[in-house]
């Protein structure tokens, strides 16, 4: 089973104490140990860089970016076909954000069914299943 890693997973691990921190850490440990086949996208990496640079935390931007690149052997590019599909998802999926629509489109276009995320918005996307984080 291949799992798409959303930006909030490594960001919870790197962040302040939070109820999602330990489940996120356990998941990333499984990825690092190759018990989970993980992938992500260039858009996820962009989100990480954007978030931490906007906070003035370039150290964390680099650290979290490097972690994701290290443990995700596949980083999917975002293409015109993906943004076209994201546009379509926005019109048929109530309440989905543009960012989540791009992630979902990349996943669907690469036949990745599972996502590791704490974002319940993905539950509304047909063809996407959110991994339970425990």
Label each residue range with its predicted role.
Residues 1-40, 53-62, 134:
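Short, well-structured N-terminal submotif of metal-dependent ribonuclease cores
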Residues 2, 104-134:
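Acidic, PIN/NYN-like endoribonuclease modules and their adjacent C-terminal/linker elements
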Residues 10, 45, 122-123:
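A generic structural signal for short hydrophobic patches within well-formed alpha-helices
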Residues 74-116:
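Active-site neighborhoods of divalent-metal-dependent phosphate/nucleic-acid chemistry enzymes
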């Amino acid at each position: 089973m291949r799992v798409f890693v959303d930006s909030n997973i490594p960001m919870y691990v790197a962040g302040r104490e939070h109820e999602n921190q330990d489940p996120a850490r356990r998941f990333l440990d499984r990825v690092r140990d190759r018990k989970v086949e993980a992938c992500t996208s260039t858009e996820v990496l962009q989100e990480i860089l954007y978030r931490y640079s906007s906070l003035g935390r370039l150290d964390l931007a680099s650290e979290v970016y490097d972690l994701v690149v290290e443990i995700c052997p596949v980083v999917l590019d975002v293409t015109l076909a993906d943004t076209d599909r994201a546009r379509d998802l926005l019109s048929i999926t109530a309440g989905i954000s543009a960012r989540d629509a791009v992630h979902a489109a990349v996943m669907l276009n690469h036949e990745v069914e599972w996502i590791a995320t704490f974002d319940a918005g993905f539950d509304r996307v047909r063809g996407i299943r959110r991994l339970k984080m425990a």
